Amino acid sequence: MRLFKSKEKLSESESVYLADIEQKIKAYKAKGYRVPTRKMIKTAAQIKGIRRSAAINTAVLDLVAAHIHEGMTTEEIDTLVYNFTIAHGAIPAPLNYEGFPKSVCTSINEVVCHGIPTPDRVLQEGDIINVDVSTIYRGYFSDSSRMYCIGEVSEEKRKLVQVTRECVDLGLTMVKPWNFLGDMAQVINDHARENGYSIVVEIGGHGVGLEF
């Protein structure tokens, strides 16, 4: 059975291209690798929807960057995220997901992830905070987080934030056709360890695109 089908007649170059993909996928599968199903390969319309969702998601983080400050509560960050997301025709994905009560995760200092915004937690000078935003736009999911330094932070915290950003940038260089997720994970892990850090292995990522 062919992995790729089309109701439209393909050009010769398109046929050769798809045949090449089929052969590569079959070869990987024969070696025991997990390979993408046809469902995982997105259509042009789906990619457009995912990109729109991601654009809103990024705009939320930019908005937080413009407003976050010492004395702000994490509840105020949550309100900011919720209002902006709804105003742009989208939905905050975390809200009520498996009982999560808020629209965003706010993780401060030693909190690894999934911190819950509250009216009692006030940002203080020297804090570092990760704001993790997930957006649903017309059924398409996007997710990204960003670190923010509140005022002057210690050199220890500054270095952690900087190296983490470098890890992300290195990981992105591995996101290309026929690479493995493990290629991305490897360069991130290597750079973190070279700088005296380690990866949080107990917590993995989650889906974006058509699933959360």
Descriptions of predicted regions:
Residues 1-212:
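Active-site neighborhoods and metal-handling regions in enzymes and metal-associated proteins
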